């Protein structure tokens, strides 16, 4: 049996591979058509102009669904391993909410481009990266709470390093983007897709985009740490019938006679 066939380990694997493919395909399309600069564009800029925005939106919507599934499975796994630990239960529920909000933000970023609906796009980015960072932080705390009884210390340390990586990237992106978009460099900078080294704010722009890509990579790394955990869990859907028919009320008896849809004489 292959490693991705064990339990539900294919979920985080598929999430990372699919999302990375969405970024790569839209990036290649955007630079081939000269819609963005090849050196560190914003991730969402590679999905701003047609046709790549269609690919970007469709693939990230699927990525959001995979992310919801991954976050839910993680929630169920932690709950099953710690059914009576109140502190862990509260943190686990908080992590579920934060993760789902991050998935919602990912879908908003994918479908509302900054050149069309800037406010909605920024709201989606805040949900994706902000709630996503908090989700990683909560899951790292849970990993600390569950070691060494549930898993080894290595998992906690790896996730802690990834959270620190994410935090440094988030701080850099937030600081530089705040300076870049405070109005000092012009109002049209929001719609700007092409940058030259001579442009005002170029350095801040490059730091912001580099931090955004770095933050995304930290997300990928964090979800990859779920692979080993998910090899040890499976979920199943069980159908429970609340009656033997689909009538709202009991049907009237017809003396074992059946009404034909078409007359036999036809």
Swiss-Prot record:
Similarity-based family: Belongs to the DRAM/TMEM150 family.
Membrane topology: Multi-pass membrane protein
Pfam families reported for this sequence: Frag1 (PF10277)
InterPro entries: DRAM/TMEM150_Autophagy_Mod, Frag1/DRAM/Sfk1
Protein name as it appears in the record: DNA damage-regulated autophagy modulator protein 2
Main location: membrane
GO BP term, pick one: autophagy
Localization, UniProt: Lysosome membrane; Photoreceptor inner segment; Apical cell membrane
GO cellular component term of the entry, any: apical plasma membrane
Gene symbol of the encoding locus: DRAM2
Function recorded in the entry: Plays a role in the initiation of autophagy. In the retina, might be involved in the process of photoreceptor cells renewal and recycling to preserve visual function. Induces apoptotic cell death when coexpressed with DRAM1.
